Amino acid sequence: MRSLRLLFPALLFVIPSAAAAQGATAAPDERAAVLAVVQRLWDAMKARDTAMARSVFDSSAMLSRAVTRNGEARVQLTPVSAFLEALSHATEPWNERMFSPEVRIDGSLATVWTEYDFHLGDKFSHCGVDAFQLLKTSAGWKIVALSDTARREGCQKQR
């Protein structure tokens, strides 16, 4: 009985941490499904295919960019509709590539954090970090938010 009293408090610490670790670890097939959505967006951008691009976003999705102007950090919000409109007028393919993506999944919520570089056609434009939030819906994984940074310096993987 005494050993049970000692074991119970220990289990209170072990069980929640094991469950948390398991929840954040993505099963290989779910990880692949989440990354496929991101890649589908980039394939759509390269092809300038607005229908394909629209298909990866949830209807409530929003895009945001962290920018610094006059030494002050701000968030620049862009509706998906404005992004799609710009894509429809692109004269060159938008070529974005990811490097070393980190995927976290807990139930129906997934996050992808990845470095990227961006080219207009074959010409380097900028690099940064993309942070995707995805929701698993009845239609599959959908992007509900995409935040990024963009810079021209310190881009080690731009070729």
Report each predicted region and the residues it spans.
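N-terminal signal peptide c-region/cleavage motif recognized by signal peptidases
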Residues: 14-18
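Short beta-strand edge/turn micro-motifs at domain boundaries
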Residues: 111, 126-154
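Bacterial N-terminal signal peptides that target proteins for export
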Residues: 1-8
